[in-house]
Each structure stands twice: as structure tokens, then as C-alpha cells.
């Protein structure tokens, strides 16, 4: 691995440990020439299906877009980064598990809502309001009423 400070090709690994539930390896490295230390992360590159948008166009899966949508929904809510990363990981695993080369943006949106409803109800309503393009206050009321009905049916208080 090249040193990011002096571009030397000789570096040594000082420490390695598993992170992200064992899906990544974090390595502390030291350059043998300039003695600067830096961190690298190593993970398997998994092929994600392409996304078919509502207008029929196709584009590569964009994890940053998925993460951005979730972060906007949970902004200023009591949801930890670990919970967010776990939800994103589960969504990606579900998409890969379909075995399909292409998935619809609608499927991704529904998976996002399924995870948000379990993480934080307010974040779920925020995301649903944009995803389902709520036009007026009554649609918010309907979504909230549905959440409350689902809560009472599941026996939670």
C-alpha cells in the first residue's frame, strides 16, 4: 500500500481489527520511510443490483443516496449511527438476496420505510411524507393514524 504522505511503497501493518460486525478490517499502518501513521479499511466489494427509477431509467445503486435519505429522516432524532448502519446493511443484504440484476426504486423506498418504522416513528413519517409526496395535512394524519392502528394491533403500548 502506498503511503498517502510520501507515496512510498513500503508500509507495515501495526494493528488489525474487525469492524462493522466483522464485514470490514480496520488496519493501522506505518510508513517505513517517513514514519507517518494512517488507517485503512478493507471490505469485500459486493455487486449491487441496478435501480430502475419510476420514469423507467436505470442507474447504479448508490449507497450514499440511501444513507443520505435515512440521515435526513432521522436528523435530530434519538437514533444512533450504529442503528442507522445496521438498517442500511440489512436493506443492502435484502436487495442482494433478491438475486435480481435490477430492483425498482419503489422496492428500495418500501424497504427504507420498513426499517424506519422500527427505528423511529417520527423519522418514518418524515420519510413517508417525501417518498409518498404528501400534498396536505390530512395525508400526514392518515399516516399517523395508520401507525397508531398498527401499534394497537400488534399489542404494543
Curated annotation (Swiss-Prot):
Chain's role: Negatively regulates transcription of bacterial ribonucleotide reductase nrd genes and operons by binding to NrdR-boxes.
Requisite cofactors: Zn(2+)
Protein name from the UniProt record: Transcriptional repressor NrdR
TM spans (from-to): none
InterPro entries per record: ATP-cone_dom (IPR005144), NrdR-like_N (IPR055173), RNR_NrdR-like (IPR003796)
Keywords: ATP-binding, DNA-binding, Metal-binding, Nucleotide-binding, Repressor, Transcription, Transcription regulation, Zinc, Zinc-finger
A Pfam cross-reference name: ATP-cone
ATP-cone domain: residues covered: 49-139
Species in which this protein is naturally found: Shewanella loihica (strain ATCC BAA-1088 / PV-4)
Zinc finger (unnamed): 3-34
HAMAP family: NrdR
Keyword Signal: no
Family that this chain belongs to: Belongs to the NrdR family.
Molecular-function annotations in GO: ATP binding; DNA binding; zinc ion binding
GO term, biological process aspect, one: negative regulation of DNA-templated transcription
Cofactor note: Binds 1 zinc ion.
Amino acid at each position: 500500500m502506498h503511503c498517502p504522505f510520501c507515496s512510498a511503497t513500503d508500509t507495515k501493518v501495526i494493528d488489525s481489527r474487525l469492524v462493522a460486525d466483522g464485514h470490514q478490517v480496520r488496519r493501522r499502518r506505518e510508513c517505513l520511510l517517513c514514519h507517518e501513521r494512517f488507517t485503512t479499511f478493507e471490505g469485500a466489494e459486493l455487486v449491487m443490483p441496478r435501480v430502475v427509477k419510476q420514469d423507467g431509467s436505470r442507474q447504479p445503486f448508490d449507497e450514499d443516496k440511501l444513507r443520505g435519505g435515512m440521515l435526513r429522516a432521522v436528523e435530530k432524532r434519538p437514533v444512533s449511527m450504529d442503528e442507522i448502519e445496521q438498517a442500511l446493511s440489512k436493506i443492502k443484504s435484502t436487495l442482494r438476496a433478491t438475486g435480481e440484476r435490477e430492483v425498482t426504486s419503489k422496492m428500495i423506498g418500501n424497504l427504507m420505510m420498513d426499517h424506519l418504522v422500527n427505528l423511529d416513528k417520527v423519522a418514518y413519517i418524515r420519510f413517508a411524507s417525501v417518498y409518498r409526496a404528501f400534498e396536505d395535512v390530512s395525508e400526514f394524519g392518515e399516516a399517523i393514524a395508520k401507525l397508531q392502528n398498527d401499534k394497537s394491533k400488534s399489542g404494543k403500548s
